[in-house]
Amino acid sequence: QSVKTIYPTKDWAISDFVVTAPEFGAKAEPGFDNRAAFQAAIDAAYQSGGGVVYIPAGNYEFRSTQVGTKNVRVRQGHSETKKDFHFEYVLRLHPGVQLRGDWADPASHNGKVLGTILEVRVGKDSPNYDGSVESWWNDGQADNALRTTYTSIADRFIEMNAGTGVTNLSIWYPEQDIHHVKPYPWTLFQTQGDCATIERVTLVNSYNGFNSAPSELHYVLNSYMTALNKGIEVHVCTDIGRIENVRISPEYWANSGLPGAPSLEDVTAYTRANGTGYQMHRSDWEYVSYLYISGYKTGVWIGREPGFADAPNAQLYEVHVGGCGNGLYVEDVNPYGILISNSSFGAGQDGNAVYFYKDFSTSVQFNGVDFKGSVVGDGDGGVVSFESCTFSEYNDYALRMNRGNVLLSQCEFKKNAGHVYLGANMHTLKSVNSGDKSKLKVDNHS
């Protein structure tokens, strides 16, 4: 049946499973634990072959958890055994089920969080908020080669399985205190399978936002979040995850209008010292566009899976990062490389627009990218190319390349000096029509 919403939506809300219906019994009332009612509606939708579980506007509290089990191929020296590990979760979305509410876009309401709000009042200071165990797995993309990895057994608020969605709602942790921050489990956790979708969602003050565990085809779009520790984290996505039109910033908690919301200055002080906006480990052909991040210790982090060498390749378009300690931190990239275009990376005070770690040894291409702050390279064998880029607001040097190889083409430097520093272990610099009025100033110590 069609459900009438209070706030505008891009499509009709159609649902036969409304959580407040008598057969489920959810209540937007203080002190009422909605876990069982919501799970009953989710289970009913799944048993009917899938569908939308609808949540009318209101504040719904969650005060208890369920226990899940993960069977893991645990390492024992050079052999293995299987072992069960337990974790806690609040809601489990079965395949083919979408959880949908009535969502007000904060950008249209002066930042206010309105409509369907899920209040998480369980999980504070969980010892297993981001737990993992060393394990083995066979990589189907590499002739089933045996890999060492770490399997997440972390607690989570909503567990997402194949073909599930969380849309048109907000999630809030009322007991989080910016002056005494406590870890909470992941808000949204794609545990396995393909096609987990998060759309038109506001994460008001998650500790950790969305985790995509080994799977494929995650899709996060048209969403907002303040995450105090990690916003989005991707692990072993073996085909085409997508991030589109997502904004990660301290402002969404500060401007939420919800009780206890701290000042923007206080939230930024914490995230600038501790937080990472988007963290991509191995992902094969990740597509990221219109991602906006500000006020974090690290805006975008790209690198290896914990414990082994697999790293991502990706295309990033219209990614804009500002006011971060490192706008972009590149630990490593797989041999297919990373392409970044029509984007901008800005550093906060004493930060770097981009930093390449010593393990970087492949390729990153920047095309039409603005850098506000220094680009620093410590990668030994990699190639970094810049096409039609601009460099401004740097301190001593726009490019401080201590190692590696750099290609410059049609790049503009906004100062008449301090363009490039080449360290003693630098291999190659090639430049065409780049510099201040095409005059490139190089301080060569190689």
Task: Report each predicted region and the residues it spans.
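Extracellular beta-strand/beta-solenoid scaffold signature
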Residues: F38, T69-V90, L114-I158, I178-Q190, ...
